Amino acid sequence: MASIVNRTNYGFLDIPPELGEFVRNDTYSLLIKGRSGTGKTTLSLSILRSLKARNNFFYISTRSSPKQLFEHYPWLRKFTKQSNKDIDKEEIGQNISSFEDARLDEPESLFERVTNQLMDVKNPVIIIDSWDSVASLMDREARLNNERVLQTWRERAKAKLIFTSDESTESSLESIVDGVVELNYEFMDETRIRSLFLKKLRGVPVKRSIYYFTLKDRFLRCFGSYDPREFRCINMKDKIPNVVNSPKHILQTGYQDLDNHIGGTLPRNGLITIEKDSILSNDIILLFVNDLLNNFFRRHYSLLLDTTMKNEITQKYRLNIQNNGKLYTIEKHASSEKYPQNGIKQKDNYYKYLSKLISGFPENEKLITLIETKSLDNIISTPSDIEELCGFIRKKFELSILILNSDVNLEKYYAESDIYLRFILKGGTLFLKCSIPASALFGAYIASSVPQIQLDHVL
């Protein structure tokens, strides 16, 4: 069990562990390639951050000025300890001498800068962003010769040499460097999803070739592999934090990225539908719902759960609420046993039962309900039944959450939803996909804190 807990630390990675092992070698050459907008500059800076190379690095940019880099990546100020420097001043070269503006350099001038660093600095990290701008000004023979010379000097100086390139085809440089990382992106329902391909890492076993990542907050962070065992290893030590003067009756999920995407707050009298790919563990839904319910309790909402869902959450996850008196149950017989021979009568009985149950609560009670659609199969079968159900619960509850674990008319549930969420598995990575109100993708992983499922917007 301990090994599973340890593995959860890799749910969210700065860079892939294989790449991390490679860049910690004493000397190497690395090519980061990919079309424009894939995140090459961000990855090269993230490698600097991973190496904690604050002084002995030399970043040559043929795309942006140092001023632009510090504007685009505000965290660079703290990382390079330049927070008190004004990079707009003329003495920029002295203040942040590790960053060089080479946009107007000729190949000979740039080449001289690099070789000087290789000769004068001990074990430097040198990044050329991008090599294309330099290579395009040289003929093929000069380019091949300069690339070989750089490799020779790099080995002698025990340096780390990193190139970026927009070239999609295999270049002469790719054949002589020690490592090649290729960045790409694709679109999933109007959402861009980024990937990192470990094409070659000399001397390092590559256990996983492709990682998905986000550029949220202008950092590159990769998502680890989905392991269903992690969702069964529940953190029972940390308690739900008591928030002093926590705002009452604010409808939010508690996941900042998700709340920001849907507009800050959940719709009052709204309907959220949640489901998952069939290959995924049921524990994902249960743990996600457990996190949601704990957040609603902190906001002073009362919860009305169907029997099966309540039993699973309270027994398996020991729902960590601050007032169990605010947790109510929809009895199982309410939808199944009293009128087995008459579907219409059975459905009417269910609505009467809920209405009577709700009428017994104080007038100012703010209720959120959580229901599995599977528990309603015997009374909900047609699109009109679903429309009637959704209309009823909208009127009765501040918020309604339906767990879609039945195959009956799923499209109608989608159409009735204000927010539709689905856990999906892509390339071994777990994501939460939001299709309604607008398409978005969130990397989902386990953390050793509360809430235990973490969501990070894929940007």
Predicted regions and their residues:
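Phosphate-binding/switch region of NTP-binding enzymes
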Residues: 163-219, 399-459
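Pre-Walker A adenine-sensing motif
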Residues: 9-23, 253-266
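Conserved P-loop
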Residues: 31, 35-96, 279-339
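Long, basic/Gly/Ser/Thr-rich N-terminal segments
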Residues: 105-224
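Charged, amphipathic alpha-helical linker segments immediately N-terminal to NTP-binding catalytic cores
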Residues: 1-3, 202-246
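Short hydrophobic/aromatic beta-strand immediately N-terminal to the Walker A/P-loop
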Residues: 29-33, 271-275
